[in-house]
Amino acid sequence: MIWMPMDKKDQLAELISNAETSFYNGQLQEAFSLSLSAIKLDENCADAYQYAANVCMSLSRYKDAIEYYQKVQIYIMLITQIEMNL
């Protein structure tokens, strides 16, 4: 995740937490909507893409799920490279 003001970080954390809760409560459309809101707030948030992908898998939207999972993989690789260079 790229540096951002704390209130934006808090907002992102809340969106991800709510997406997770909605997903595990079977509220898939709500989880997807929250995930997309998180992505709009921070397009580098792997967790947001992860929940969007999980929802798509649950709804048998496999092509969309693959696209979101690929973004998760890209961001994880970038984070790993950054951490290795620190």
Please annotate each region the language model reported.
Residues I2-E14:
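TPR-adjacent "capping" and linker segments in tetratricopeptide-repeat scaffold/adaptor proteins
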Residues Y24-N25, S58:
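Register position in tetratricopeptide repeats
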Residues S37-K40, Q73-I74:
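Conserved structural position within tetratricopeptide repeats
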